Amino acid sequence: IRGSDYPSILEDNRIDIPYADIAVDGAGGALCAIPFRQIHGRIDSLGFRIGNVAYSSDISDLPDESEDAVRDLDIWVVDALRRTPHPTHFHLEKTLKMIEKIKPRRAILTNLHIDMDYETLINELPENVYPAYDGMEFVENQAIEKQS
């Protein structure tokens, strides 16, 4: 991948037209998603919107042109790698500022580094923001369960 410091280990299946619907068919049935451009350090990455849910991992910035893709969401699953700034990922403060700007109904923080303790985060995050955990499941427009 041009500009990346990491060798590619996956088969290259390019999505050349961001913001245009793509369809994927798999074991769970057909799925329609809208890819949108994100910044991931010196390279671009793609986020995906599926209905009123968006997924943004590997993101260090969201270009203005992509903001409409994450407006009016029920759930935004979004990168929050660690507490301190990182060159290729959102850090907690930046993630929370973006959540405040984009205003999803709820947000789930993902790609959390080991120093992002679940119990600590649960006690300090805004009421509509949840740290993800292994095995977490959610359903659009239904309550998000906290890990017990």
Please give the residue ranges for each predicted region.
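Binuclear metal-dependent hydrolase catalytic cores
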Residues: 1-56, 122-148
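A general structural motif
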Residues: 36-40, 57-64, 87-90
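Binuclear metal-ion centers of metallo-dependent hydrolases, dominated by the metallo-beta-lactamase
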Residues: 63-75, 80-148
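Short, hydrophobic beta-strand segments that form beta-sheet elements in well-ordered domains
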Residues: 54-57, 108-110
